[in-house]
Amino acid sequence: MNLIFRCLVLFLTMMGSEVIFASSGVGNTLDFGELAAFPGAEGYGSMTTGGRGGKVYIVTSLADNGLPGTLRYGIEKLDGPRTIIFQVSGTIFLLKDLKIRKGDLTIAGQTAPGGGICIAGYPVTNYASNVILRFLRFRMGNKECVHPDGADALGGKGAKNVIIDHCSVSWCTDECASFYENDDFTMQWCIISESLRLGGHTKGPHGYGGIWGGEHSSYHHN
């Protein structure tokens, strides 16, 4: 096979398609073996498939009203495997906590034009399995979010097969990024910084990088 054809076959396979060759009237499936979540994925969460083979949902609005075209709609309303890509760039100011409860999800922040995507104002928490988050900025802050005991800018627990890659997480009132009680989890090549020590926590001065743990969890190059 020439190089172009090899690349096409690899692309179709990564998209979840079965590639079949005709040989003497018999179909043969080309098997590449198990594929990583994406090139460069490492650690226990590296084989997460996310939304591979499913629908593609395009974010066309920075609003947080939950209508079609918003990030919240793609996360909370759609079912089944899905990959979320962005036609817009800028900051999504959340109106309330954003909770990921439906798995088989990829959020590809690298698809946003310009300066990319920032998610601000409230916590983002993952409770779903088989989730890929890439190239996103999380800036919770303490202006809109009222959590007396503090809140994590990005967090999650109780999930399996999760990988977070090339994200930056800052401005929390508890921990910036806390992930525990997960299995087959990776957080890699992320910036975790600038917790708000005087952010309004009931304990007084309080603000930390994160609580990390779980079974088969990898934290590297952060």
Kindly give the residue locations of the regions a language model identified.
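Positively charged n-region of N-terminal signal peptides that target proteins for export
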Residues: 1-6
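Bacterial N-terminal signal peptides
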Residues: 7-18
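Boundary at the C-terminal end of the N-terminal hydrophobic targeting segment
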Residues: 21-27
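Acidic Gly/Asp/Thr-rich repetitive segments characteristic of extracellular carbohydrate-active
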Residues: 36-84
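Acidic glycine-/aspartate-rich tracts in secreted/extracellular proteins
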Residues: 63-65, 82, 89-91, 111-114
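Extracellular beta-strand-rich solenoid/capping regions of secreted or surface-exposed proteins
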Residues: 71-80, 92-108, 115-135, 140-160, ...
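Right-handed parallel beta-helix
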Residues: 104, 108-109, 129-142, 158-171, ...
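Conserved positions at the start
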Residues: 151, 174-176, 207
